[in-house]
């Protein structure tokens, strides 16, 4: 790991807000590289990711890779694709899924990490937390509308998505345009960025 990236990694571990995780031997879970051309900003690692120490190592990750049109090898190559969740630790289980990422976490750590990745050309925002934070939206703004209007954000280097969780299968069935119209554009964007010299 590059010394600048390592310094941030160690600072995250040393931060008092993460002391409970550090005491339990749990490191922050994200993947970055100076050469990354795409950054995927998701919610927070799930229980499987925390256990295996591999981000997006579940059914949601399989679906996301399919949406992006990339292999597992490409997805986990930090010099091509950076994986930067809104919280680098599993926040625990809630009533209807995982708890949300902690407030203020992304604001504290993302800027320094993104500054070390000057080649990023596309930021894929996965789920409501990432979409609202990076597109500066209100909680009242409809995620479905934002995702449908993806072309309004491509020029700014962002591509908003719903979360690929199996729990969103009903949303997928109610919004067939997503698979038919949006995903082909996403795949083309990802491919174009990765193929750029």
Kindly give the residue locations of the regions a language model identified.
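A polyanion-binding, active-site-adjacent surface
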Residues: 1-148, 152-195
